[in-house]
Amino acid sequence: MTSSTSTAATAQAHGRFIRGSVSKVRRVLDQIRGRTYRDALIMLEFMPYRSTGPITKVLRSAVANAENNLGLDPASLVISSASADMGPSMKRYRPRAQGRAFQIKKQTCHISIAVAVQTDS
């Protein structure tokens, strides 16, 4: 993207303890980073990944924060940063042969999205 963003008017939202691996969430975030709010919503709607649901919720929350707290127009917003960090793993046990048990880790992640006003340069 050729447009730059302003750091003065930035709104952000976080989704914490989201079920799903970090790598699968980052795969989607890499595709919407730097895009406008409308383009990102359209892309998320038609992507075949399970992680698009929580990402859409966090994106809508960030835009609502920009609209209500900063008075910004949603049509002029661009995703300035989007990241996913590792959360705690839930440990479960699966019974195996001869009385053994294998550990299964159900991964979680933290999603952070920041939106800013798009400036034409």
UniProtKB/Swiss-Prot annotation:
Q: Which family does it belong to?
A: Belongs to the universal ribosomal protein uL22 family.
What is annotated about its quaternary structure and interactions? Answer: Part of the 50S ribosomal subunit.
What are the boundaries of the signal sequence?
none
Q: What task does this protein carry out? A: This protein binds specifically to 23S rRNA; its binding is stimulated by other ribosomal proteins, e.g. L4, L17, and L20. It is important during the early stages of 50S assembly. It makes multiple contacts with different domains of the 23S rRNA in the assembled 50S subunit and ribosome.
NCBIfam families given for it? Answer: rplV_bact (TIGR01044)
GO BP terms, alphabetized: translation
| Protein name listed in UniProt | Large ribosomal subunit protein uL22
Keywords assigned: Ribonucleoprotein, Ribosomal protein, RNA-binding, rRNA-binding
| Gene Ontology CC terms, in alphabetical order | cytosolic large ribosomal subunit
What HAMAP family has UniProt attached to this entry? Ribosomal_uL22_B (MF_01331_B)
